[in-house]
């Protein structure tokens, strides 16, 4: 099932370059493949996958290592179907409305913090080949995928990025990727439309063994208290992108039911 979904994903991703977006194009195809758990989250062996995903997105289901096996097809349908794109669109729009409501400074110190993986860049081609999060995380295989530099942009995040730049807001990318992945990350971001940024912050060795919350809090604190920036917004797919200190005026959580980072 994962390979079939990946074929649809890659084929429609190519079409997106000419037609604008890939998600709406595959909606009917995905629903033709609907297995025992459809995108409405019907019960599977006593488990509602829709309810499980809701618990994940609200940070009530925490500390999990893998997606429940019985939810693989449901998560695949969600991620490659139209609902994921619709959910992301609502969040990106609210983020833009938030910025429009602010009195932006003229000193060039207003910044917006973006996470990278599953926020600006999508690793769906990788996860479609690995059970949409059902398989345990394999750092060797995932890092090999990252080094290809082939991650596509998340369309709604790219739109938000461009709108923020048009308003004079500077962008900072704050990612859990490590410093040795800087070059490929820069190249990948630029190749899909993220052409400029104020800073790209990657995880240095001094944060080895630290939680994502501790690492990102420290970096945001430095941005505000040492560099003099004002974080007007912060968007990510993990709650660990948004919790801790110096989180910004508002935070925005994008959907991601494929993996958990605490």
Where are these regions (language model features)?
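Acidic, Mg2+-coordinating phosphoryl-transfer loop and its flanking beta/alpha structural elements
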Residues: 217-262
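Active-site-proximal beta-strand/loop segments in catalytic clefts of secreted hydrolases
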Residues: 115-117, 124, 174-177, 202-205, ...
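Substrate-recognition element of Asp-dependent hydrolases with the DxDx(T/V) motif
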Residues: 118-119, 148, 157-190, 199-204
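Substrate-recognition "cap/lid" segment bordering the active-site pocket of phosphatases
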Residues: 179-232
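Active-site neighborhood of HAD-like aspartate-dependent phosphohydrolases
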Residues: 85, 105-111, 120-152, 166
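Second-shell loop/turn segments in exported
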Residues: 78-85, 143-150, 172-177, 209-210
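Non-catalytic pre-domain segments flanking phosphatase-related domains
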Residues: 2-114
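Loop/turn elements at helix/coil->beta-strand transitions in domains of secreted/extracellular proteins
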Residues: 107-110, 165-172, 195-199, 227-232, ...
